[in-house]
A protein has these predicted regions:
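C-terminal-of-GTPase-core extension/linker across diverse P-loop GTPases
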Residues: 1-77
């Protein structure tokens, strides 16, 4: 099964036109690798909007499991 994850830049609306297609059960680390291979090494935290979080946005760590149509904003060190 596949899920759609959308990215968001700080101060800008989410980019719903160009999402990432990933397997169900992937973590924030997998999303970082899909964006850029060195992004996971520079990862500080992520803000996630969607059904995988209790609050919108919620600050999550690298092991957070993403769900379909989540929006992620990655903050680097």
């Amino acid at each position: 099964m596949l899920i759609r994850v959308y990215t968001k830049k700080p101060g800008a609306p989410p980019d719903f036109d160009d999402g990432l297609i990933l397997r169900r059960g992937v973590s924030v680390e997998h999303v970082c690798h899909a964006i850029h291979r060195t992004l996971a090494d520079q990862f500080k935290y992520a803000l996630v909007w969607g059904t995988s979080t209790k609050y919108s946005p919620q600050r999550v760590g690298i092991s957070h499991i993403m769900q379909d149509e989540d929006v992620i904003q990655v903050v680097k060190k």
